[in-house]
């Protein structure tokens, strides 16, 4: 199975700007990328980083400057077998969570994200294509139905938890065990309780 990890190497994670400056966002994004890629390796698959610009890392990199949809759909179109796509900001991902995704039956296997996104999927049907705009999980369900694909969804807290907003950093500190969590702690982030709600402070 070809495993693809899309990554914005230019200006990643802009919604974290209230708490991280641009160089910090790049460093933190690369820490999350490493967590995801190493987790994929740990279950005996090799990740291919699908990046918007060249990225120095220990994994194969394919540079595609086009939109996320165009870049991923090209990977799907040229594949001669199953393709898995796992987003680079799944800082809580574990080998067990990915193994569940990869082993699940179905021609299309979807891992919904919080807020309506699609954080990972496996496509075993050659006609499946992506549309990541807006609530993409509903679009991907519809696309799978239109091509007649047998579709399975994997309900996983760790696959559903992507890191886009400052509030998401609390989940990384609470549940993360990899480089991203370590990076936050090394840069002065810790948990804070505010009226019973967990957040982060620096």
From Swiss-Prot:
| InterPro entries (UniProt xref) | CofC (IPR002835), Nucleotide-diphossugar_trans (IPR029044)
Q: Does the keyword ATP-binding apply?
A: no
Q: What class of enzyme is it?
A: transferase
Instruction: Write the Enzyme Commission number(s) for this entry.
Output: 2.7.7.68
Gene3D superfamilies named in the record? 6.10.140.50, Spore Coat Polysaccharide Biosynthesis Protein SpsA, Chain A (3.90.550.10)
Q: What reaction does this enzyme carry out catalytically?
A: (2S)-2-phospholactate + GTP + H(+) = (2S)-lactyl-2-diphospho-5'-guanosine + diphosphate
Q: How does it assemble?
A: Homodimer.
Q: Which protein family is named in the record?
A: Belongs to the CofC family.
Q: What is this protein called?
A: 2-phospho-L-lactate guanylyltransferase
